[in-house]
From Swiss-Prot:
This is Interferon-induced protein with tetratricopeptide repeats 3. The gene is IFIT3. Belongs to the IFIT family. InterPro entries: TPR-like_helical_dom_sf, TPR_rpt. Residues 474-490 have a biased composition (Polar residues). TPR repeats lie at residues 51-84, 94-127, 136-169, 172-206, 207-240, 241-274, 415-448, 450-481. The modification Phosphoserine is found at residues 203, 478. It is found in: Cytoplasm; Mitochondrion.
Length: 490
C-alpha cells in the first residue's frame, strides 16, 4: 500500500470510537493485575458481556506488545457479538472493528487495516457519518470499559449519555448505578439510593446491584434494611462470584466475620488464583483477633491458643495472597476499616508502577477525608498522587524543584491554595511561613465580607486580583474540599 494511503489512514484513526481513542490509561500504563481480572470476568461473566471484556483484553495485549494475541481476542469478540446481538451486529461491532484497524496499523498490515476501515465506513454511512456515529449502545460499551479501568467518572458520563436516548434501558441504568456506587468512595461525590433502586426496578434479576444497594444502605446506618437486599441476592444467585464477594464485604463491615470468611472462601472455589480474596480472608482473621482482644476474651484460659491460631491463619492467607501475585496497593485501597498504619503504610513503600501508586495515594487521600481522619495525611497523600502524575510527564523539573511540588501542580486560583501551602510549610517545620499562608487563605475566604475584614490578611493588589481569581477558581471553601478535584488536576 502506498505512503499516501498510509497518511490517509492516519487521519482516520483518531475518528474511530474504540479503546485506542478512549484514553483509558494515563501514558498507556496498565496496572499489573488488570489483565487477570479481565480474564476472570471472561471466564465467569454472562456471555453477552464477554465481548466487551475481550475487546479490553485485546487492548491490554497490544499495550504489552503482543499484537497477535490482541487479534485473537478481537476474533473472539467478533464471534460473540454475532451470537448474542445478531440483530445489531454491525453497530455493536464498530468498536471491535476500530480496534482491528489500530492493531493492524501497528503491525504494518495496512491492507488488512483498510478492510476494517471499509466495514466501519459502510456502517456509519447509514447514519450520514463516515467513521463514527452517536449511538447509545456504543456509549454503553465505552461505559463498561471505562468502569473496568477504574475511570468511574467517565463511565458515569457515558451511561448518562446512553440513558438520554433510552431512559428505561436496564443495562444502561445498571451501569450508571454501579459507576455512581464506586464514585461514592469520594466524599464529595456521594449519591442517594435512588439510582440503585431504579436500576433494580428496571432489572430485577440483577443481583449484583441489589448487593450494592445493601452496602450503600449499610453505609447510611440502615444495615438491617440493607441486609434484606443482600440476603435476597445470595438466595437468588448463590454461585455468582461478584455477588458473593460484595456480600462478603457487607458482612465483614457488619462484624459477622465468620459469614464473611465463608463467602470469600466460596468465591475462591471459582477463582483459586485470586490473591485479593486471600488478602480479604486474612484481614477478616486479623479483625477476629481484634474482636476477641477488645472484648477481653483473650484473657480467658482457652482463648490464647485460639488467638494464636487466628493470627497464624491471617499470616497464612496473607502469604498466600503474595504467592498469587497480589498487588498490595489495590488490595488495601478499598478497605476503609483497615486504615491503620500496619495495613496501609506498607504498600506505599513497595516497588510498583507509578500508575498504581498514584491511584492508591488518591484513594487513600479520599478514605482519610471520608472517614474524618487526619487532614494532614489526606493532603500528604493527595500531593503524593499529584506528584507522581507530574513526574510522569516532567520528571526532571520535579527532580530539580522538590520543595515546590504543590506550586507546580496547583495554580494560585485553585480552591484553598494558600491553605495547602500552609500545610506544606507546617510539615516542613516552617511555622512562620505556614501562618502567613493561613492568613492569606483567611483573606480569600473573607475578601467579600461587608466589614472589609479581608483587608487585614491581604494586600491591596491581592484584593484587587481577587474578583478575577474567584471567578476562575472553584467555589470550594472548606479545607476538607482541598483535593476534591484532583482527578481533573492529574
Amino acid at each position: 500500500m502506498s505512503e499516501v494511503t498510509k497518511n490517509s489512514l492516519e487521519k482516520i484513526l483518531p475518528q474511530l470510537k474504540c479503546h485506542f481513542t478512549w484514553n483509558l490509561f494515563k501514558e498507556e500504563s496498565v496496572s499489573r493485575d488488570l489483565e487477570d481480572r479481565v480474564c476472570n470476568q471472561i471466564e465467569f461473566l454472562n456471555t453477552e458481556f464477554k465481548a466487551t471484556m475481550y475487546n479490553l483484553l485485546a487492548y491490554i495485549k497490544h499495550l504489552d506488545g503482543n499484537n497477535e494475541a490482541a487479534l485473537e481476542c478481537l476474533r473472539q469478540a467478533e464471534e460473540l457479538i454475532q451470537q448474542e446481538h445478531a440483530d445489531q451486529a454491525e453497530i455493536r461491532s464498530l468498536v471491535t472493528w476500530g480496534n482491528y484497524v489500530w492493531v493492524y496499523y501497528h503491525l504494518g498490515r495496512l491492507s488488512d487495516a483498510q478492510i476494517y476501515v471499509d466495514k466501519v465506513k459502510q456502517t456509519c454511512k447509514k447514519f450520514s457519518n463516515p467513521y463514527s456515529i452517536e449511538y447509545s449502545e456504543l456509549d454503553c460499551e465505552e461505559g463498561w470499559t471505562q468502569l473496568k479501568c477504574g475511570r468511574n467518572e467517565r463511565a458515569k458520563v457515558c451511561f448518562e449519555k446512553a440513558l438520554e436516548e433510552k431512559p428505561n434501558n436496564p443495562e444502561f441504568s445498571s451501569g450508571l448505578a454501579i459507576a455512581m456506587y464506586h464514585l461514592d468512595n469520594n466524599p464529595e461525590k456521594q449519591f442517594s439510593t435512588d439510582v440503585l433502586k431504579q436500576a433494580i426496578e428496571l432489572s430485577p434479576d440483577n443481583q449484583y446491584v441489589k448487593v450494592l444497594l445493601g452496602l450503600k444502605l449499610q453505609k447510611m446506618n440502615k444495615e438491617a434494611e440493607g441486609e434484606q437486599f443482600v440476603e435476597e441476592a445470595l438466595e437468588k444467585a448463590p454461585c455468582q462470584t461478584d455477588v458473593l464477594r460484595s456480600a462478603a464485604k457487607f458482612y465483614r463491615r457488619k462484624g459477622d466475620l465468620d459469614k464473611a470468611i465463608e463467602l470469600f472462601q466460596r468465591v475462591l472455589e471459582s477463582t483459586p488464583n485470586n490473591g485479593y480474596l486471600y488478602h480479604q480472608i486474612g484481614c477478616c482473621y486479623k479483625a477476629k483477633v481484634r474482636q476477641m482482644q477488645n472484648t477481653g476474651e483473650s484473657e480467658a484460659s482457652g482463648n490464647k491458643e485460639m488467638i494464636e491460631a487466628l493470627k497464624q491463619y491471617a499470616m497464612d492467607y496473607s502469604n498466600k495472597a503474595l504467592e498469587k501475585g497480589l498487588n498490595p496497593l489495590n488490595a488495601y485501597s478499598d478497605c476503609a476499616e483497615f486504615l491503620e498504619t500496619e495495613c496501609y503504610q506498607t504498600p506505599f513503600n513497595k516497588e510498583v508502577p507509578d500508575a498504581e501508586k498514584q491511584q492508591s495515594h488518591q484513594r487513600y487521600c479520599n478514605l482519610q477525608k471520608y472517614n474524618g481522619k487526619s487532614e494532614d495525611t489526606a493532603v500528604q497523600h493527595g500531593l503524593e498522587g499529584l506528584s507522581i502524575s507530574k513526574k510522569s510527564t516532567d520528571k526532571e523539573e520535579i527532580k530539580d524543584q522538590p520543595q515546590n511540588v504543590s506550586e507546580n501542580l496547583l495554580p494560585q486560583n485553585a480552591p484553598n491554595y494558600w491553605y495547602l501551602q500552609g500545610l506544606i510549610h507546617k510539615q516542613n517545620g516552617d511555622l512562620l511561613q505556614a501562618a502567613k499562608c493561613y492568613e492569606k487563605e483567611l483573606g480569600r475566604l473573607l475578601r467579600d465580607a461587608p466589614s472589609g475584614i479581608g483587608s487585614i490578611f491581604l494586600s491591596a493588589s491581592e484584593l484587587e486580583d481577587g474578583s478575577e481569581e474567584m471567578g476562575q477558581g472553584a467555589v470550594s471553601s472548606s479545607p476538607r474540599e482541598l483535593l476534591s478535584n484532583s482527578e481533573q488536576l492529574n
